[in-house]
Amino acid sequence: MTNSPLAGASVRPLASACPEQAAASIIAAAHDLLGHFAAGRRIDAPALRTAMQSAIGASDASGAWDWKAAYEAVEVAQLLFMRRYGPAIHAKTIDPFERLQLVERIARLAPTQTRRSEEMQAYQQFSTPLGLAWVAGFAAGFH
């Protein structure tokens, strides 16, 4: 038995959806995941799957979304977190190493990207870790 609201209907994969719809779904999932980061809760596979299913209305098993899209939602959630709490991190300490430690604490809550699609492997697509992105921004003088 399936709980999918799309049971019996053909499911259009997120990757083949119009770009605006795909982006909106990823952003919706990211907003769900933002609460995990804000509460200091680790985002595991079940939490990520729940956020994606809620945003898209179907499971990965149905082909409506893949883990590449799910990992993109996590990355967007990290950006949302930094937009919201970055100024507080910046105000907490003037030491850039202490700031980096706070950023890394958030990064450790994100899941590792172990489920890689053939496309990701073929193009050697890897994400920039949050800490490295923060260091690059710091070096560039972004505040």
Over which residues does each language-model region extend?
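Class I S-adenosyl-L-methionine
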Residues: 19, 23-143
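Glycine- and charge-rich intrinsically disordered segments
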Residues: 1-21
